Amino acid sequence: MKIALYSDLHLSVHPLELPPTSADVVVLAGDLQRPATGMAWARQFAQPTLYVAGNHEFYGSDLASTMAELRQQAQGSPVRVLEREEWRHQGVRFLGCTLWSDYRLFDSPEQREKGLQMAQEFVR
């Protein structure tokens, strides 16, 4: 199976036109751009296309509403939005999960600060 993998394209900063691909599956692994324009770009592929959101898809929003928006926009297209889900194609199992954290857990300033501290320690 041939897979075309695209990630961190940041299309709002660097627009990109891709040539047609002969891949069996297209995987969009996050950070395309905001949901509406990112999904419009994702829908260009004729192949089954998997879209796993990255942190940039959530800017100015939250996980639940952004995922709902992406799923709604994917309806009627070959794009499948994966969030803690799997999809099987030609005997291959694809798993998708966003690795983004909302540091406003329970809207508690203490929890947000603790989460940010933990993230900074992890990066070091």
Task: Enumerate the language-model features and the residues they cover.
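Proline-centered loop/turn at the N-terminus of a beta-strand
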Residues: 48-50, 80, 93
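Solvent-exposed, flexible loop/coil residues
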Residues: 13, 91, 104
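Generic beta-sheet signal
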Residues: 52-54, 84, 97
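N-terminal active-site segment of His-dependent metallophosphoesterases
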Residues: 1-51, 58-66
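Glycine/small-residue-rich loop that forms an oxyanion/phosphate-binding "nest" at active or ligand-binding sites
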Residues: 63-87
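Beta-strand-turn-beta hairpins that frame and shape the catalytic cleft
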Residues: 1-4, 86-96
